[in-house]
């Protein structure tokens, strides 16, 4: 990005604004609270407390145009091979809508719709049985997205199915889950793109044995034959996914089977509709008014121009407590790259470390560092305007904390006692959902997906591969025989010492 024509001008704006006080920016642009706000369907965004001004934003958008960001979105939605290292499209948007006239994307949408009908039919079959509990086994993109949505949108009581998620290869996770369930009233879903994932195969074997066979086992995989063979699952209970959808973008596909069981099929479709509506905003809105573009460019500004190494996400709605973990994978697996599309080294830092938690709990853990630490951490604060629980006073208190914390981080407070002085200057974006509905959550997740793509285009990297996860898995596979007491050639001296300790 530093080699773009407009970078020097952008850098000059950063030098000018790095030490600027956020109240001074607001005073210089009196209309800033509304001019830097956007409403897209059920989502409201306010960027007024970010440390840029109109001139800096114009320079950012100039580089976005130089990077052909609008064309990059067209290529994404039309099903061109934007995943160049694996020579694949990235058609997660086609799982939820048909927004272009491109045959590849339209065919993908039709295929996904057919599979979704199969999901609905399987749910109807399960509703006619005595099954009350579902154990969903997957990891990474096969777990984090479904787990987030099911937890966020499940009814407080009265759901037809209780869905339990197991991901970790640690047997304690499966043991604790199964200890509360009756195998005669439980079904299992095994989700793995390749059906070669160690965690899913090991946990799937435990579940298969506990259930007493495969009669109530289902699978979702891009390798359906392997899935059916591994656990003797009838082909009619194996749902496909495709290599043109990455795992972390796959909750909209049959990977969402446990979501539909947890919240109901109709509400699952509403989730997809919400995402598709936000997709339409991204595809059809000029860059300057495009919220996903502004969110992504803000992340680039904070990372590359202001030097922020981390980014925090705080969800002021307990039902969204799993969102930071989901975003960690979406953002860091997509953008944790050190080479560009052509294999050359990047010319600027890429992804920040994303982390966070649920408010107000986090105010009593890491907010001390946000307010008075030496690192400036940009943040997203996410809340809901309306809440449907019966405790209205609690919701008022929750939203008061959103307003108070963002103001305190931005403005700070002087004190004659340096220990009680708040420097301020901490930027944040506030995102408010009208209410936590399936449509709103779908739109929110879509926004973050597209923000990630914006950043990848600006940095010239591939957001859709993840080769960095492979080496550790390969080494773990090679070390398994040694841990079982078999002879193995282990070259690394530290690993040899640790093996000796583990083997006693």
UniProtKB/Swiss-Prot annotation:
Entry GO MF terms: carbohydrate derivative binding; glucose-6-phosphate isomerase activity; monosaccharide binding
Name of the protein this chain belongs to: Glucose-6-phosphate isomerase
Location (main, coarse): cytoplasm
Family matches, as InterPro entries: G6P_Isomerase, G6P_Isomerase_C, Phosphoglucose_isomerase_CS, SIS_dom_sf, SIS_PGI_1, SIS_PGI_2
Family matches, as PANTHER family: GLUCOSE-6-PHOSPHATE ISOMERASE (PTHR11469:SF1)
Annotated catalysed reactions: alpha-D-glucose 6-phosphate = beta-D-fructose 6-phosphate
Pfam families, alphabetized: PGI
Compartments where located: Cytoplasm
One Gene Ontology biological process: glycolytic process
Enzyme superclass (EC): isomerase
Role of this protein: Catalyzes the reversible isomerization of glucose-6-phosphate to fructose-6-phosphate.
PROSITE patterns from the UniProt entry: P_GLUCOSE_ISOMERASE_1, P_GLUCOSE_ISOMERASE_2, P_GLUCOSE_ISOMERASE_3
Enzyme nomenclature, EC number: 5.3.1.9
GO cellular component, one term: cytosol
Family membership: Belongs to the GPI family.
Catalytic residues (positions): 333, 364, 473
UniProt keyword annotations, A-Z: Cytoplasm, Gluconeogenesis, Glycolysis, Isomerase
Origin: domain of life: Bacteria
CDD domains recorded: SIS_PGI_1, SIS_PGI_2
């Amino acid at each position: 990005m530093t080699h773009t024509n407009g970078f020097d001008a952008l850098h000059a704006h950063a030098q000018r604004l790095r030490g600027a006080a956020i109240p001074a920016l607001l005073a210089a642009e009196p209309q800033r609270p509304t001019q830097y706000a956007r409403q897209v369907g059920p989502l409201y965004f306010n960027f007024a407390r970010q440390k840029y001004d109109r001139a800096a934003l114009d320079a950012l958008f100039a580089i976005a145009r130089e990077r052909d960001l609008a064309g990059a979105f067209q290529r994404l939605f039309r099903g061109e091979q934007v995943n160049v290292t694996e020579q694949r499209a990235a058609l997660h948007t086609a799982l939820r809508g048909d927004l272009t006239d491109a045959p590849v994307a339209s065919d993908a949408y039709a295929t996904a719709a057919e599979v979704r009908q199969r999901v609905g039919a399987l749910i109807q079959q399960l509703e006619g049985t005595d099954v009350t509990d579902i154990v969903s086994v997957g990891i990474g993109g096969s777990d984090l997205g479904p787990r987030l949505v099911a937890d966020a949108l499940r009814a407080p009581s009265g759901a037809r199915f209780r869905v339990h998620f197991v991901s970790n290869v640690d047997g304690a996770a499966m043991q604790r889950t199964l200890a509360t369930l009756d195998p005669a009233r439980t079904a299992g879903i095994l989700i793995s793109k390749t059906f070669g994932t160690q965690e899913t195969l090991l946990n799937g074997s435990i579940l298969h044995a506990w259930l007493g066979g495969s009669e109530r086992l289902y699978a979702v995989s891009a390798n359906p034959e392997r899935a059916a063979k591994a656990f003797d699952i009838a082909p009619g209970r194996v749902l496909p996914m495709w290599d043109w959808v990455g795992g972390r973008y796959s909750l909209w596909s049959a990977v969402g089977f446990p979501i539909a069981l947890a919240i109901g099929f109709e509400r699952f479709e509403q989730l997809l509709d919400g995402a598709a509506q936000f997709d339409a905003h991204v595809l059809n809105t000029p860059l300057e008014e495009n919220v996903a573009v502004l969110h992504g460019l803000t992340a680039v500004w904070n990372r590359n121009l202001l030097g922020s190494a981390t980014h925090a996400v705080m969800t002021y709605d307990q039902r969204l407590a799993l969102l930071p973990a989901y975003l960690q994978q979406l953002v860091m697996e997509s953008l944790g790259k050190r080479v560009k599309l052509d294999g050359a080294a990047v010319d600027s830092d890429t992804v920040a470390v994303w982390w966070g938690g649920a408010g107000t709990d986090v105010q009593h853990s890491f907010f001390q560092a946000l307010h008075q630490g030496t690192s400036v951490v940009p943040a997203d604060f996410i809340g809901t305007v309306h809440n449907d629980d019966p405790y209205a006073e609690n919701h008022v208190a929750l939203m008061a904390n959103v307003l108070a914390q963002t103001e305190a981080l931005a403005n700070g407070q002087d004190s004659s006692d340096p220990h009680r002085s708040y420097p301020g200057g901490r930027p944040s974006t506030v995102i408010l959902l009208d209410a936590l509905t399936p449509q709103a959550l779908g739109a929110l997740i879509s926004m973050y997906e597209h923000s990630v793509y914006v950043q990848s285009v600006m940095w010239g990297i591939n957001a859709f591969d993840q080769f960095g996860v492979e080496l550790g898995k390969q080494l773990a596979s090679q070390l398994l025989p040694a841990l079982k007491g078999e002879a193995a050639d282990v070259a690394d001296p530290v690993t040899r010492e640790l093996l000796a300790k583990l083997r006693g």
